[in-house]
Each structure stands twice: as structure tokens, then as C-alpha cells.
């Protein structure tokens, strides 16, 4: 049976939100400078309050679709806007992974080639049942967490924490406020876990384990931002497409063993893949009464994602400007939209 425990749900939270800010951290560091990690802490606190409010409301009805539809026509409109956010995440996942692989590993391989391999593999997984996806999420997220811990330990000796000083020089500038807004938008991807609440076998411990997952996620991202700035400095880390890859290249043991890229590529491929699966499968869950043929839907959906992803990744500078726009879109579709709907539903 398709059942989910609250402990398992914690892995869905991690899988949906752990990778984005870490992957293209230069987008945020370019705006927030050496204080980006502190700005992230503010973003995390704001988002935590909203997301936990969502979970408390969902405890009365675990089916998020029913919550939206209870608002009649207005609720249907909000549901479609909310679902569009899942499509945005699918595009973000496919394009960022393909761009990262192309830029860091296979420069001579075109991005469309990477996209095809990614979408074929994801299409195969999406055609499976929920239990298969659950197992994949649990194994992948757990393995990635272990890899992140090992990578952070290995990179510790290369960090120069003087790059983090002075703290909050110049106060809160316009760019820093923009960085906070964009990071809240990025964290909004955590909301793709909400459609999976309907699979919970029990509500017991939902807030507890979800809070633990969010705390782990925030600590890892917070540590990643600190290590990136301490390793490269605020100026350089804000002007490199994928700073974590540069960090991983520096790892060396006994002047002989170099394997940091292995951690990076494993984490990047696995977590973006999981995020894409969670977002795409959420759409299938929400509209399973409309989707009569799952295979045809996956083919059409993957084709649309391919076209949009290929278009926005034609140029890296162009793509990283698109990423800022995508964060704002996620903020509107995945945070503000359900916040509006849940507020009306609750009152």
C-alpha cells in the first residue's frame, strides 16, 4: 500500500529544498556579499513560520487539493497557480543539472544532450508507483547527507574565516533585501512536499519531524554558504557560476588523492533528479482524475520541460538571470498562493 510515515515525510522535505541554494549560491552571494549566510538565516526563519503554519492547517485535511477546491472557483484558480510552481521547479531542476554538468565536466557536450538523458531517466521513474519513488527518495537523500558531511569535513582546512568579516558592513542595503526575498523563493520549493501528505498513515509527529528536517536542511545550507564565502571570498564566490564545484576540486589527501568532484557530481545529479521527480509526480497526484494516460502525459510534460529548459540555458549569463526570475516565480506560486488559500480556508 502507498503509505508514508511522518519520518519518511521528513526526507521529502529535505529532497525538495536541500540542493538549490547550494548549487547556484553565487546568485545570492553576488547580492548579499559576505553576509549572505546571515541573510539566509533570516529567510529561513520567515519561511519556517509560514511552512509550519501550512502543516498545522493540513493536519485538519491531509489532501491539499481538497483544501483548495473547498474555496470553489477561486480555489481552483489558486490550485492551478500552485501547480504551475511545480512545473517551474521541473524546469529549474532539469536546466540547472544540465547546465552544471555541461559547464563543470563535459564542456564539449551540448546542454540539450544532457537534458535528453536526464528527462528519459526521470520519465522512467515517474512511470513507477509511489512506493518505488519513496524508496528512491529515502536512499538518495540519506546518501547525499552523508556525502555532504564528509565533504564539509574535508574542506574545513582550506577555509579562511576572515573573509566573513566585517559582519553587516553597510547595514541592510537594497541588494541584501533582494537576496532575502530570492532565498525565501528558493526555499518555497519545500512546498512540493505538501501533496504527499495524503499518503501519511498517521499525523503523529508531523510537526516534530518536519521541524527536524527543516533544521537539518537550514544548517547544511547555512554551513555551505559560510564555507563557500570562507573558501573563495565574497567577491569571487559571487562571480563563479557553481562555487561548490571549485571548492570540491581543492580537496587533496596526502598530496596524492583527489576525489572532491566525486562528491559534487553525486550530490548534484542525485538531488536535482529527486527534486524533479517530486515536483513532477506532485502534478500527477493532483490531477490524476484528469490524466487518463500517464505515459502520454509524461512524454508531453517532459517535452515541454525540455523545450523551456533548452531555451533558458543557451547562455550561462542569460541562464543565471533567469534563475533570479524563477525564484520570484516560486515565491508567488508556492508560498504566497497557498498562504492566501490556506488563510481563507482556516478562517
Which ranges hold each PLM region?
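Membrane-interface interhelical connector segments
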Residues: 231-260
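Membrane-water interface regions at transmembrane-helix termini and the short interhelical loops
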Residues: 30, 102, 118-140, 199-202, ...
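Membrane-interface loop-to-helix entry segments
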Residues: 112-113, 125-155, 323-339
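Hydrophobic, membrane-embedded alpha-helices of multi-pass small-molecule transporters
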Residues: 5-24, 39-43, 47-50, 82-86, ...
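Extracellular/periplasmic helix-loop-helix junctions in multi-pass membrane proteins
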Residues: 291-298, 309-332
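Small-residue-rich segments of transmembrane alpha-helices in multi-pass membrane proteins
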Residues: 72-83, 139-155, 216-223, 304, ...
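Hydrophobic alpha-helical segments and their helix-loop junctions in multi-pass secondary transporters
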Residues: 4, 87-90, 94, 126, ...
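Membrane helical hairpin/interfacial module
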Residues: 21-111
Amino acid at each position: 500500500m502507498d503509505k508514508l510515515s511522518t519520518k519518511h515525510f521528513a526526507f521529502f522535505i529535505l529532497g525538495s529544498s536541500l540542493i538549490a541554494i547550494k548549487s547556484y549560491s553565487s546568485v545570492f552571494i553576488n547580492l548579499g556579499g559576505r553576509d549572505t549566510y546571515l541573510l539566509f538565516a533570516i529567510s529561513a526563519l520567515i519561511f519556517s513560520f509560514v511552512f509550519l503554519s501550512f502543516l498545522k492547517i493540513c493536519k485538519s485535511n491531509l489532501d491539499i487539493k481538497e483544501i483548495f477546491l473547498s474555496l470553489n472557483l477561486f480555489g481552483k484558480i489558486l490550485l492551478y497557480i500552485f501547480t504551475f510552481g511545480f512545473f517551474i521547479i521541473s524546469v529549474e531542476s532539469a536546466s540547472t543539472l544540465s547546465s552544471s554538468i555541461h559547464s563543470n565536466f563535459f564542456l564539449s557536450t551540448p546542454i540539450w544532450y544532457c537534458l535528453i538523458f536526464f528527462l528519459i531517466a526521470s520519465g522512467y521513474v515517474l512511470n513507477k508507483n509511489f512506493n518505488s519513488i519513496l524508496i528512491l527518495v529515502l536512499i538518495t537523500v540519506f546518501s547525499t547527507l552523508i556525502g555532504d558531511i564528509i565533504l564539509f569535513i574535508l574542506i574545513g582546512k582550506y577555509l579562511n574565516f576572515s573573509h566573513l568579516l566585517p559582519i553587516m558592513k553597510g547595514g541592510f542595503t537594497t541588494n541584501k533585501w533582494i537576496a532575502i526575498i530570492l532565498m525565501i523563493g528558493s526555499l518555497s520549493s519545500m512546498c512540493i512536499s505538501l501533496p504527499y501528505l495524503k499518503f501519511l498513515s498517521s499525523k503523529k509527529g508531523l510537526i516534530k519531524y518536519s521541524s527536524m528536517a527543516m533544521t537539518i536542511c537550514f544548517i547544511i545550507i547555512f554551513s555551505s554558504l559560510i564555507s563557500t564565502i570562507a573558501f573563495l571570498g565574497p567577491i569571487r564566490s559571487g562571480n563563479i557560476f557553481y562555487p561548490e564545484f571549485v571548492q570540491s576540486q581543492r580537496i587533496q589527501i596526502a598530496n596524492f588523492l583527489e576525489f572532491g568532484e566525486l562528491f559534487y557530481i553525486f550530490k548534484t545529479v542525485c538531488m536535482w533528479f529527486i527534486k524533479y521527480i517530486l515536483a513532477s509526480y506532485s502534478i500527477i497526484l493532483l490531477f490524476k482524475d484528469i490524466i487518463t494516460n500517464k505515459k502520454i502525459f509524461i512524454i508531453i510534460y517532459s517535452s515541454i520541460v525540455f523545450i523551456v529548459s533548452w531555451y533558458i540555458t543557451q547562455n550561462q549569463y542569460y541562464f543565471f538571470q533567469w534563475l533570479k526570475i524563477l525564484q520570484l516565480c516560486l515565491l508567488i506560486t508556492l508560498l504566497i498562493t497557498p498562504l492566501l488559500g490556506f488563510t481563507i480556508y482556516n478562517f
